[in-house]
């Protein structure tokens, strides 16, 4: 996923498995970020094994490192610095990352995202988590101002964009309530299924 564009497992989404409903571009963002970074470090912990990769200017330095771990926690940590030879400005506002991770937490119910922001004065930590996904987000947004409960619709469908393309699967969840103080209509595409 980090070394080859479009190497992710989401493209074979019609045969079941991990990414059964995904239409996302897994492998594009991770690889493009790695290629355009001064450095990128990736650590993955799963199945009592820790995997690490180190990249510099698009090159994998040292290959895949694998070691046993006693950690019961699993997950992926990515740390990188955009390359100033690629980008004219690498000062990305923290609000951008906060917004993206909040939306990802919303569409990935029960999955916690943690953002560490290293500053000159120390380390800031932000956590994003919605146990019930968009339902909790709607409740949080409306607060006590809703005059109905949050209603949800969930559905799964198959579709095809063109006759010469294969069918794909889609999963959708809609959550809404009524409020005369909060007016919003938002759409989020989750490419993480």
Question: Which residues does each PLM region occupy?
Answer:
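GHKL/Histidine-kinase-like ATPase module
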Residues: 95, 102-104, 110-193
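Short conserved segment of the HATPase_c
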Residues: 1-7
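GHKL-type ATPase core
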Residues: 8-140
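Short, functionally important structural connectors and interaction interfaces within domains
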Residues: 3, 17-20, 179-180
């Amino acid at each position: 996923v980090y070394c080859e564009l479009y190497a992710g497992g989401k493209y074979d989404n019609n045969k079941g498995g991990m990414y059964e409903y995904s239409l996302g571009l897994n492998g594009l963002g991770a690889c493009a970020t790695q290629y355009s970074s001064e450095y990128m470090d990736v650590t993955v912990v799963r199945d009592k094994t820790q995997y690490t990769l180190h990249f510099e200017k698009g090159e994998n330095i040292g290959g895949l490192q694998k070691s046993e771990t006693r950690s019961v926690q699993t997950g992926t940590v990515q740390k990188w610095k955009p390359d100033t030879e690629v980008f004219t400005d690498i000062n990305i506002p923290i609000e951008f990352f906060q917004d993206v991770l909040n939306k990802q937490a919303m569409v990935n119910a029960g999955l916690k995202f943690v953002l560490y922001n290293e500053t000159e004065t120390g380390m800031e930590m932000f956590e994003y988590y919605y146990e019930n996904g968009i339902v909790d987000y709607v409740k949080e947004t409306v607060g006590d101002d809703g005059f109905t409960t949050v209603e949800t619709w969930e559905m799964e469908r198959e579709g095809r964009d063109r006759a010469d393309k294969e069918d794909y699967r889609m999963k959708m969840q809609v959550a809404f309530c009524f409020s005369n103080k909060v007016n919003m209509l938002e759409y989020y595409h989750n490419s993480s299924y």
